[in-house]
Design a protein with these regions (language model features):
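Acidic/histidine-rich catalytic cores of soluble enzymes
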Residues: 112-179
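Glycine-rich anion/phosphate-binding loops
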Residues: 12-23, 50-68, 125-132
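Hydrophobic faces of well-ordered beta-strands that scaffold small-molecule active sites
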Residues: 1-4, 35-40, 78-80, 147-149, ...
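Surface-exposed, active-site-proximal loop segments in enzymatic domains
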Residues: 8-16, 42-60, 86-98, 111-120
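Acidic (Asp/Glu)-rich catalytic clusters
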Residues: 15-39, 68-72, 103, 138-144, ...
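Active-site-proximal, glycine-rich beta->alpha crossover segments in alpha/beta enzymes
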Residues: 63-131
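Catalytic domains of carbohydrate-active enzymes, especially glycoside hydrolases
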Residues: 1-7, 27-32, 72-78
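Active-site-proximal loop/turn and secondary-structure-junction residues that shape catalytic pockets
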Residues: 8, 41-43, 82-86, 151-157, ...
Length: 179
């Protein structure tokens, strides 16, 4: 089984179309494998949803289309994240055998500037997520697609002025209780 993280699919109009998703699935199947999941769409497909921006409702409509198209293309799982400022890393670290590994050093990362227009509160981010979940979950159920959410990476409280919600088991429990 194959999972693609943010596949390079044309995002005309801020959404993925059915034909491109079917082509991707068929391409994987040509090699005797199964495309089981897509993890993440480009952040600019849903950043206004995460931050309650002026294009939130437009992006929700586009994401509804995208989720429907993923399901209708025969891809059973869609994973996403709630990190509008992406995964954070600091310079790589040398590990056993002299290999280099990705790293995050909070002493460095916590000093980085704001990534968006202002600081956001954790409750704002939860309210935005709740709004999204109550809309997208019934769509996913209707289409027979499963949703997954990526943990905050790194799992620290806040980076660049944006709270990182999924850093604990309690956060996942809170998510499940929304819908």
């Amino acid at each position: 089984d194959i999972l693609f993280n943010t596949p390079l699919i044309s995002g005309d109009g801020g959404k993925w179309n059915l034909q491109d998703l079917v082509k991707l699935r068929l391409r994987v199947e040509q090699f005797g494998m199964k495309l089981t999941a897509l993890e993440n769409v480009p952040t600019n497909f849903y950043d206004h949803i995460m931050l309650n921006g002026p294009r939130r409702d437009e992006q929700i409509e586009n994401m509804i289309s995208t989720v429907r198209n993923i399901a209708r293309a025969g891809i059973p799982i869609f994973g996403y994240n709630w990190m509008p400022s992406h995964v954070w890393r600091t310079p790589p670290k040398s590990i056993r055998g002299g290999a280099l590994a990705t790293a995050y050093d909070h002493a460095l990362g916590s000093k980085y500037p704001l990534t968006h227009d202002r600081e956001y509160s954790e409750e704002e981010m939860w309210a935005n997520l709740e709004y999204w979940i109550k809309i997208i979950t019934p769509i996913a159920e209707e289409e027979g697609i499963r949703l997954g959410i990526h943990p905050s990476d790194p799992p620290v409280p806040i980076l660049g002025g944006i709270p990182r919600l999924f850093r604990s088991f309690a956060a996942y429990k809170r998510l499940i209780e929304i819908y």
